[in-house]
Amino acid sequence: MTATWEKKEGNEGLLTVTVPAEKVNKALDQAFKKVVKQINVPGFRKGKVPRPIFEQRFGVEALYQDAIDILLPDAYGEAIDETDIKPVAQPEVSVTQIEKGKDFIFEATVTVEPEVKLGDYKGLEIEKQETELSDDELQEAIDHSLGHLAEMVVKEDGVVENGDTVNIDFSGSVDGEEFEGGQAEGYDLEIGSGSFIPGFEEQLEGMKVDEEKDVVVTFPEEYHAEELAGKEATFKTKVNEIKFKEVPELTDEIANELDAEANTVDEYKENLRKRLAEQKATDAENVEKEEAITKATDNTTIDIPEAMVNTELDRMVSEFAQRIQQQGLDLQTYFQISGQDESQLREQMKDDAEQRVKTNLTLTAIAEAEKIEATDEDIDKELEKMSKQFNISVEDIKNTLGNTDIIKNDVRIQKVIDLLRDNAKFVEGTKED
């Protein structure tokens, strides 16, 4: 077999492949064995017609398409290896010759990975992130944890305040006419949650139980119900009940409830500070890495093939479908609710898809330029890490994946990202840890 590659404009080229006649004849033999089982010829049992009779009656041409189907996949794969090209989409194939006793010749128009022209990726200026945990951040985390233990208590006296949960009846109207979905009784609303039309919750502050009030608001211009968008509405509102969160005091007992390894408040704070500091350092490093990746990608010049963007869009739509499935929705239901279709969703995702493709190509090109590879030791460490994280044996992970190619590539790219950050110049007058 011989193959030649002729580069064309952009990211396309013409692959011309010639398969020797002897392979063609073998493929025709295989094709005959397949086809003869499916035909009936008077005077012969089904599947027993001799080859000469078959060709006399139907012509050898009746075997050509099956022979092509047999020859093409292997021939195309070998041609890719021989010419060392990297296709990014299915080729457009045109058969130029298929005939008994002659070579099989076909041409394939192939879209290949684009040329990546790297810009600066070392010495990038990135902002050094704060890693020191403040006392305020620690207290905020403590308050947040205590908030989960809070109990809702009825406010016997007093007025509605931000953070309270009020039980209300309301009836909304526009131009004196009630509208669908604008009425409810016994509705619980947390003041400050932002779950109602802007301005509604704030107007309830200061009200007392059994008090009634006309709450006047204006629907946002981008409101999902077009007939209400931008219009002023009046909600006749009555407060039935007011509840507030009663947050427990941090005691040794509560500290142990929040952290089984802490027996005192001080131990709880110490453990929490350590965890938060570690997380803040990790988050800071990730932000710095993301900035380095973005700048390295921005400095790279690539003519991205549309086929690669479409492949990434397919992946993103699939990921989106999985996410909404966890919320009990399928794509078609989502489209009905949102008023979108798949083409509109893909259009919304297109910029992100292009950026993903460009980033992946950039990081891969840097790995090649720097001769970065994942060693067996690197892969073993990553497998051990995954084993601990998901509580699965290394062998089970290997069996699930089939091979370690995905892990190998992930580790390789992570090494590139580390290189970008390690070689960056940190600004804002701070220094790297």
UniProtKB/Swiss-Prot annotation:
Cellular location(s): Cytoplasm
Entry GO CC: cytoplasm
GO function term, MF aspect, one: ribosome binding
Catalyzed reactions: [protein]-peptidylproline (omega=180) = [protein]-peptidylproline (omega=0)
UniProt KW keywords: Cell cycle, Cell division, Chaperone, Cytoplasm, Isomerase, Rotamase
PROSITE patterns the UniProt entry points to: FKBP_PPIASE
Main location: cytoplasm
Residue stretches making up the PPIase FKBP-type domain: 163-248
A GO BP entry: chaperone-mediated protein folding
Enzyme Commission number, as recorded: 5.2.1.8
PANTHER family per the UniProt record, alphabetical: TRIGGER FACTOR CHAPERONE AND PEPTIDYL-PROLYL CIS/TRANS ISOMERASE, TRIGGER FACTOR-LIKE PROTEIN TIG, CHLOROPLASTIC
Family, as annotated: Belongs to the FKBP-type PPIase family. Tig subfamily.
Function: Involved in protein export. Acts as a chaperone by maintaining the newly synthesized protein in an open conformation. Functions as a peptidyl-prolyl cis-trans isomerase.
Description of its domains: Consists of 3 domains; the N-terminus binds the ribosome, the middle domain has PPIase activity, while the C-terminus has intrinsic chaperone activity on its own.
Protein's name in the database: Trigger factor
Organism (species): Staphylococcus aureus (strain bovine RF122 / ET3-1)
